[in-house]
Amino acid sequence: PNLKDFTFVGEEVVELEVKASTDKITMNCAEITISSASVNIGGENIESKDINYDKEQEIVSIQFPSKLQLGAGLLSMKYTGELNDKMKGFYRSKYTTPNGEERYCAVTQFEAADARRAFPCWDEPAIKATFDITMIVPKDKVTLSNMNVIEETAHQEDSGLKIVKFARTPIMSTYLLAFVIGEFDYVEDRDEDGVLVR
């Protein structure tokens, strides 16, 4: 996320299974602009040329030029969004330092159906998935998520950034997912099963 202009960019890959003949994928999406979407099934990559939003229903329809093959595949998307000031979805939160300086952090509040403001998804509590979260953040900031950090590396193209990869979550609803970026301190210990907790 960019904590100066309050925007974020994302890349998402969804494992899915096409069970019925269709040329359209519909999912929840609010206050996000998808710049590209494609599906790869059976080694065939199909780019979408038509992405339509129903802002009132908070739904995006990704249209493909031909029917998708049946079977397992990957839906890949690139998108941008706003770190809003509405305290829902992926939003900015203002705080004041001890010397009186105003600063911002980026936090999430997805319950009950606001994950759609951070990434396109099927954002209903009954629909569950696992999540592999990777955050690209300023190297002087701390990022936390549901799971432990499994890898942290310097960004190859921007020395001011770092890439933080978290372990895969258990299968869960979108509203249970969380991540934060900011000037945080944290305590670290192991639970009774030896899992590192921050």
Identify what each model region corresponds to.
Residues 1-198:
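Acidic/His-enriched low-complexity segments
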